[in-house]
Amino acid sequence: MNWLEAFILGIIQGLTEFLPISSTGHLYLGRHLFQLDEAGLFLDTMLHIGTLLAVFIYYKKEFIYLIKNPFSKLMLLLIVGTIPAVVIGLLFKDFFEDISKTGITIGWEFLVTGFFLYVADKQKNGRKKMGDITYKDAFIIGSFQAAAIFPAISRSGMTIVAALWRKLDRETAAYFSFLLSTPAIVGAIILQFADVFQGKAESISSTSLIVGTLSAAFFGYIAVSWMIQYLKRHSLKVFAYYVWGLGILILTLQFTDVF
């Protein structure tokens, strides 16, 4: 893989990690486009580190607060919200890894993501702010996050959807969703590093790794800040239409043996 391909994959990871359209699904498509095999595993890990950097930079005040107040309500909300994904991930890791490798269900998963985005957008706007979020809210939102273990089910999409259903206001829904992404991204990095150390990753140039990581961080930061502002006044339907169109295209290509 050359540095330009890594740069493009970094853009894909950075934008789609925080837009509700599935980063894993788009990375799968990107690897298919560039004819990369499972190999890009180490690059995937570095791309996740890039988006993690984006979250850390955007939420630097919150993370400083969490470090100083490790038993705060916010920390407990993040822990409670992360439990479902941890349980599902540990129990079914191998099963979902096999699904991710084949990509056979990816078209259907994009359609499912679109359905949830479309339906959630019809909900009346809630009024809950960060201080109003309950542990029950966090657990339910985290349970929706666990569904994103399917490669083309959007993590940010599902958590924003759940947050809107739990009557968080639109800005807070996106804000909490991205904050909750931190433990999930860290978990993904740990699991990927475990595979890397077991020799499942290809050799890739340091230049490509650095370019991909910085690209993911830069575009991830843009996506976080833009999405929070966008959701204040705009609909999720445009994202639903996009993933529906993408899902239909993929299913058509699979049906005709083109993909």
UniProtKB/Swiss-Prot annotation:
The chain crosses the membrane at residues 1-21, 39-59, 71-91, 99-119, 133-153, 173-193, 208-228, 239-259. One of its GO terms (cellular component) is plasma membrane. GO terms for molecular function: undecaprenyl-diphosphatase activity. This is Undecaprenyl-diphosphatase 4. Catalyzes the dephosphorylation of undecaprenyl diphosphate (UPP). Confers resistance to bacitracin. It is a multi-pass membrane protein. It comes from Bacillus thuringiensis subsp. konkukian (strain 97-27). It comes from the Bacteria. Its EC number is 3.6.1.27. The keyword Transport does not apply. It is found in: Cell membrane. Keywords: Antibiotic resistance, Cell membrane, Cell shape, Cell wall biogenesis/degradation, Hydrolase, Membrane, Peptidoglycan synthesis, Transmembrane, Transmembrane helix. Bacitracin is thought to be involved in the inhibition of peptidoglycan synthesis by sequestering undecaprenyl diphosphate, thereby reducing the pool of lipid carrier available. Belongs to the UppP family. It is an enzyme of class 3 (hydrolase). Its main location: membrane. It catalyses: di-trans,octa-cis-undecaprenyl diphosphate + H2O = di-trans,octa-cis-undecaprenyl phosphate + phosphate + H(+). PANTHER family: UNDECAPRENYL-DIPHOSPHATASE (PTHR30622:SF4). Pfam families: BacA (PF02673). Coiled coil: none annotated. The keyword Membrane applies.
